[in-house]
Amino acid sequence: MKHLTNWGGILGLALIGISLVLYLLGMTEASWVQWVNYAVIAAIIYVGTQAKRTSQDGVLSYGQGLSAGVGIAFFGSVLVAFYTFVFFSFIDPDMLQDLILRMEDEMYNSGMPDAQVEMTMDMSKKFMQPGPMSAMVVLSYTFLGFIIS
């Protein structure tokens, strides 16, 4: 368990660091950012799983490797979820409103009917709040850890 929390902590801090640097540079809109995050997640899960295998005299079953990768992703995602909650609640709450407005503009510009845009936005606004977003971070990063492992 300590192994998972250590590597999960490294993963979480790495993702938070990337997010903060991009925020300070004003590059949060860049589309390539998600690919950098995926690469970091994959690399840290790989290195963490290899370290676990090494600590077990070079023997690691498929199930142990899978649980190590998912565990690392889960513990990392908990840190990122906490950061997400703090960021959108206290650091830059206006950014969330900007995202919602941009999403609405994109829907109107794509030719979506007004009624459908309104219905979609009503649903989106319920989930685009710090709490639900943080929960989605945990779910999505843990699932991604499962896929990568």
Q: Language-model segments: which ranges?
A:
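Hydrophobic alpha-helical membrane-insertion segments
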Residues: 72-94
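Individual transmembrane alpha-helix segments
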Residues: 123-146
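Alpha-helical transmembrane segments of multipass membrane proteins
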Residues: 14-22, 44, 76-80, 84, ...
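Membrane-helix interface/capping segments
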Residues: 51-65, 89
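Alpha-helical transmembrane segments of multi-pass membrane proteins
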Residues: 2, 6-10, 67-76
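Transmembrane alpha-helical insertion/packing segments
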Residues: 1-52
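Membrane-interface interhelical loops and short interface/amphipathic helices
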Residues: 91-129
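Polytopic transmembrane helical bundles with strong interfacial aromatic enrichment
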Residues: 5-9, 88, 137-141
